[in-house]
Amino acid sequence: NATCAEELIFTSGGDAVNESVTLAKLGDRASLLARLDCSPVGNMILEDIEQHINTSLLVRREDCRVPSVVVAIQPDGEHYFLVGPSQNYGLEPEDIDFSVFERTKVVSAASLYSLGEMDGEGIRLVFRKAKACGAVTVADLNTDIKSLGPDAFHDLYKDIDYLLPSYEEAEYVTGQSELPAMAQFFLEKGARHVVIKCGSKGAYYQDADETFQIGAFPVKALDTTGCGDNFVAGFIHGLLKGWSHKKCVTFACATGAVNAMSYGGHLGVTGEEQILEFLKKNEI
């Protein structure tokens, strides 16, 4: 049996790739810290992303295998993943040149629960080194596919300036169902600012000084792959521009919405002006 697809696209992806490439398209200088194998697929990934970001910090290794993923996009834009085998592709602390943090404004973990061996003391070390150099720390969450448990990062939140989980991820970690209670949980654990991505309901922001919710932009979604990563990239872009938190969240919502109108995890966004023009034409 065979199923005919309307379109097939080969592209790079993954949380950190989507986030860094979108940041670069928005006009920021972005580097990727990751392992990448030396296979033909690894070479194609490198060729794809080096058009946009600094790849000098990538660690190419013969003994690792980055997983290939088939993403099936449904008519409503939702997606299903078929993940291939992988081996030894998780970044480790010894792979990182921490001196780069001395000239870095933001260090982002994309995403907790999917960092391999770094999910633990490794990412704690990264964030502590980053903060010691004066960088802002940002973290997204992912599904707990390795069953690390909801308490896995309770010692890390105090080293996170901006935590940006999805509603479902926040619900899993906190055991709460109301947005204020979710955010308060993370704030009490030490996170300084919390942004909860709520999909079709927009995003919720809370810190010690302000609380607000921004609605979602109504768009026809072709593919929601990477929309959360694009949201984070849009938010970080706003931070780097020195915008207010409300403007950062609004821009982030728009960035995710624009991404949803194209196929692929980082192919929809072309630049800051595109997002600003989208904001002019769309009110929420």
Regions found by a protein language model. Give the residues of each.
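Glycine-rich phosphate/adenosyl-contacting loop at the front of the ribokinase-like
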Residues: N1-L33, P40-E50, A221-L222
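A glycine-rich helix N-cap at a beta->alpha junction
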Residues: D48-C64
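Short beta-strands and strand-loop turn motifs
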Residues: L82, T104-L112, G134-L141, L164-Y167
